From Swiss-Prot:
It is found in: Cytoplasm, Nucleoid. It comes from Escherichia coli (strain K12). One of its GO terms (molecular function) is DNA binding. Keywords: Cytoplasm, DNA-binding. This is Nucleoid-associated protein YbaB.
Length: 109
């Protein structure tokens, strides 16, 4: 099944990948992305741990309907969460791109 040194090489690759993934997770935790709604009138910035770092609301919205503003804030947060998820997937996929994985093996991300 594994050629000469194949299992050893696979274990070495797994160790390297684990180290890369840990480093990548630390980098991701430091990332910040901004989601928007209402054509940029509401902006929410979150970090890689999905913690809200900043909320920006255009002053013109403060005079409008409270319910609409709440909806815009929620939509901006959801947009930011979607963006951070996409960024995380892209970065984690780059970790495993150089590995020679067995056919059919899928990474858990």
């Amino acid at each position: 099944m594994f050629g000469k040194g194949g299992l050893g090489n696979l274990m070495k690759q797994a160790q390297q990948m684990q180290e890369k993934m840990q480093k990548m997770q630390e980098e991701i935790a430091q990332l910040e992305v901004t989601g928007e709604s209402g054509a940029g009138l509401v902006k929410v910035t979150i970090n890689g741990a999905h913690n809200c770092r900043r909320v920006e609301i255009d002053p013109s919205l403060l005079e409008d309907d409270k319910e609409m503003l709440e909806d815009l804030v929620a939509a901006a947060f959801n947009d930011a969460a979607r963006r951070i998820e996409e960024t995380q997937k892209e970065k984690m996929a780059s970790v495993s791109s150089g590995m020679q994985l067995p056919p059919g093996f899928k990474m858990p991300f």
